[in-house]
Each structure stands twice: as structure tokens, then as C-alpha cells.
């Protein structure tokens, strides 16, 4: 996801790049080379589900066809001011964090309706969102080091703590292991199933949202300040 110019200077100029597994650029503007039917301003978190690419764009959820990049739909989320992280449940429900003013998590249903999923006081600059293997919604705080697991009704099931604060991205593996980036400390915390939490990587400038490449068995981490991507073999 590339935001392009600031919205005030050049709205609707964001684009999506396609990368090879080694980090080389396959297509600089896979989405965004043309603007035919495209509206994309400042996209942040993204996720793939059901042959579709989802991204949050300020107060909209944008959905694209994964094979062609064609825009499919844009859903306005009332009350959103800057959505950031995104997770998609097995039934197509989208959960998206709104990091500031307000600090909440939104729920966007498959029919396009939306509502606040949680505004719990434990949310402190909520950022990364993922769905665990039991269908729970896991949210990473950037304002502290909390990693909060909610059930589907919005109740807190448990709170874990990353090794360092400033959480951003989260990946949950099939075996339940979690990886969380710290955008403030440039590190990755590993949450083992035995309760151990440890830093497995450091020195990643502005380690932001991330994804897991299951073919190469690696974490892929945007380094915002470097306009680059980092790769960590697991």
C-alpha cells in the first residue's frame, strides 16, 4: 500500500505495488496505474480473503478483485476518522481499528453495515488486528504493549504483553504462535504457546503492519521511513 501525496495536496493518488518473494518489485502500480473506477487516498492495513483484497482507507473499506486488481466496492464506515489495522473472519466480517479520535474497533458486516465493535478503555491507539484460530479478534495497541483478545461479542478474553511497546502489525500462525511488530522500537516480539514472549528481531526502522509468506516461511514487514520492506525467515 502506497499513500502517494498527502490527501490535501493530491487526493485519490494512492496505489498498490506487487512484490516478488525476494522483495524485488514485480509491478510498481499493480492497482493505480489508471484511475478508472478507482478511489484510493491513504490506505493502511490490508488483508486477503475469499479471492479479494481488502484495505482500509481513512473512513472507507475498499475491496478489490485479487486476480485482476479491479475495484469491487467501497464501503463508508460512519464514525471512522483513520482506520488502520484490519482482520477478516471466516464469514467475511471485517474488523478494523481506528487508531485516534476515537480509539475504537469497527465491525463491518458482509452486507456493508457497520458499527463500533469495541470502545473498551483498554484500547490505547489500537493498530494491528488479526483473527485467531478460534475466531477471536486480536488487537495490538500502539499506545502501550498490550495485545488484547476479544470474543465475537466484544468481551475481553485475555490480555497479553509484547516485549516492547508501540505495537503495530500482528501475524497469528496456524499453531497459535503470534508475532507482533513494534513501530516505535523497530522490533518483532514472538508469543509462544507456553506463554514466553521474546524479541526475535531488532533494527527494523518503523516496523509497521506485516504479513506472513507461507511459501517462503517468512514475515514481510514494511519499513515506512525507508520506503522499503524487511523479510524475516522463520
Describe each PLM feature range.
Residues 223-226, 231-234:
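Flexible, glycine-rich linker and terminal segments associated
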Residues 34-52, 78-96, 100-102, 120-136, ...:
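Beta-rich, blade/repeat-based domains predominating
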Residues 41-64, 68, 72:
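Acidic/His-rich segments in extracytoplasmic proteins that coordinate ligands and/or metal ions
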Residues 12-17, 60-62, 104-107, 146-148, ...:
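A short loop-to-beta-strand structural motif that recurs across blades of beta-propeller domains
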Residues 25-37, 70-76, 113-120, 155-161, ...:
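A short beta-strand motif characteristic of beta-propeller blades
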Residues 1-4, 57, 98, 141, ...:
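Recurrent small/Gly-Pro-centered beta-turn motifs in extracellular repeat architectures
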Residues 19-24, 65-70, 108-113, 150-155, ...:
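Short loop/turn segments that connect beta-strands within beta-propeller blades
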Residues 1-27:
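Beta-propeller domains
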Amino acid at each position: 500500500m502506497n499513500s502517494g501525496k498527502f490527501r490535501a495536496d493530491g487526493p485519490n493518488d494512492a496505489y498498490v505495488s506487487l512484490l516478488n518473494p525476494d522483495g524485488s518489485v514485480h509491478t510498481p502500480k499493480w492497482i493505480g496505474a489508471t484511475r478508472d473506477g478507482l478511489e484510493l487516498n491513504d490506505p493502511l492495513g490490508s488483508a486477503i480473503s475469499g479471492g479479494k483484497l481488502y484495505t482500509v482507507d481513512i473512513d472507507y473499506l475498499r475491496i478489490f478483485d485479487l486476480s485482476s486488481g479491479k475495484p469491487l466496492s467501497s464501503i463508508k464506515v460512519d464514525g471512522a476518522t483513520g482506520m488502520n489495522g484490519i482482520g477478516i473472519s471466516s464469514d467475511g466480517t471485517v474488523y478494523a481499528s481506528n487508531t485516534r479520535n476515537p480509539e475504537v474497533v469497527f465491525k463491518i458486516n458482509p452486507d456493508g453495515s457497520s458499527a463500533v465493535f469495541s470502545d473498551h478503555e483498554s484500547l490505547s491507539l489500537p493498530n494491528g488486528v488479526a483473527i485467531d484460530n478460534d475466531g477471536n479478534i486480536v488487537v495490538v495497541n500502539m499506545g502501550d504493549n498490550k495485545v488484547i483478545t476479544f470474543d465475537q461479542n466484544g468481551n475481553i478474553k485475555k490480555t497479553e504483553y509484547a516485549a516492547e511497546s508501540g505495537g503495530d502489525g500482528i501475524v497469528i500462525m496456524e499453531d497459535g504462535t503470534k508475532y507482533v511488530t513494534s513501530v516505535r522500537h523497530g522490533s518483532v516480539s514472538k508469543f509462544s504457546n507456553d506463554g514466553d514472549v521474546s524479541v526475535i528481531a531488532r533494527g527494523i526502522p518503523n516496523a509497521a503492519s506485516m504479513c506472513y509468506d507461507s511459501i517462503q516461511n517468512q514475515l514481510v514487514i514494511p519499513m515506512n521511513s525507508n520506503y522499503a520492506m524487511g523479510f524475516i525467515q522463520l
